[in-house]
Structure formats: structure tokens, C-alpha cells
Amino acid sequence: MKTQQFFKGLNTINALLLLTLAFFTFLMARITAAYMPYNTDVGFLRIKQDYIDIDHWRIAFFVHVYASMLVLLAGFTQFSSKIQDYYPRLHRAFGYVYVTDVLLITGPAGLLMGVYANGGLPSKISFVTLAIGWITFTAIALAKAKSGDFAAHRRFMIRSYALTLSAVTLRAWKWTITNSVELPPMDVYRAVAWLGWVPNIIAAELLLRSHYLRKRR
């Protein structure tokens, strides 16, 4: 009965958003599968051969790649009011998976990887800032939930997930740029280091502002 009510309650926009997120999660799963079980001569790692023998970097990379899939999957369940209404325990369980993964696994691994980013200082600053912002927003979201301020919890989860989606948008920007203009690969890398997450957080803030303004009318 709950399942039937859940699907009846989904409107077209929500259903399309969930399908879009599921599609991008599937694409990320395909990218991740290329590194399994332990492939160091594929994709991104081909430009990181100088670092592949550094134990802590290599461990951080594979931890980040594999654990990121959990973050994407757990994260996109957090913004459906229907899941919250009909399956509150599932919502909380996935929420704890998401928060634990970001705060203890994927976030710290991403921070370490940012220190070793290609493209010099601009790229390093971008990826380190991204990791710190991701961890910070997620930690605040958890604190707000524990204090019972669920409106603030939702706002910070939106910010956190906007940064989670940088894994997808970075690759989308890279594909768009490389198929539109001819630039040196490292220039593209520096550009997408920022484009991968800055527009996401701007979009999240615009979404939050518009929602806040609608509620005040």
C-alpha cells in the first residue's frame, strides 16, 4: 500500500528529476567500473602516473572512486518528500550512509587528492576548497538535524549534494569544452576544476533563495 501511494504521489517534475539523477548515477557507475578491481592504466589514472606509486595518494584515489558511488546513490534519495513521508526510516538510513561517507571517507580522500591535483596552484586551490566545503556543509547538515532544525538541515544538504554532483558536472563540462573548442588539455583541466562545482553551488543558492522567497509570499 505504501509503495502504491508513493508512486501515485510523484508528480512529473519530481519523477523526471529522480530519473535524471538515476541516469547520472548510472553513468558514474560505468566510469567507476573501469577501475575495478584495481586498474591503474585507465581514464584519469593515465595522467597521474607520477603519483600512482605514492601509497597514501593511491589509497585515497580508490577509496574516493568507490565510496563516491555510495554518496551519489544515498544522496539522491534525500530530497524526495515522498520518501520522507512514506519511508522515514529509509530516509534516515540513507542519510546516515551519506553523512558518514562524506565526513569519514570520501571527503577526506578528496581533500588529500586535491593537494596533488594536476594543473598547478589554481587546480589545487579549487579541489581543496571543494573538499572543505563539501565536508563543512555536510557536517552542518548533520548538526542541524540533531538539533531538530530540519529546515536548515535540508538547506545544507542541498548545498552538500550540489558539491557531490560535481563528480558528474565536471565530466559534463570537460566533454562540452573538448567537443567545442581546441585547448591544451591542462587548460581544460584547470577550467573544469572550477566549473565542476562553482556553478553547482550558485544554482543551489538560487534554488534556496527562490524557495525562501516563495514561502514568504
Model-predicted segments: where are they?
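Alpha-helical membrane insertion/targeting regions
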Residues: 1-217
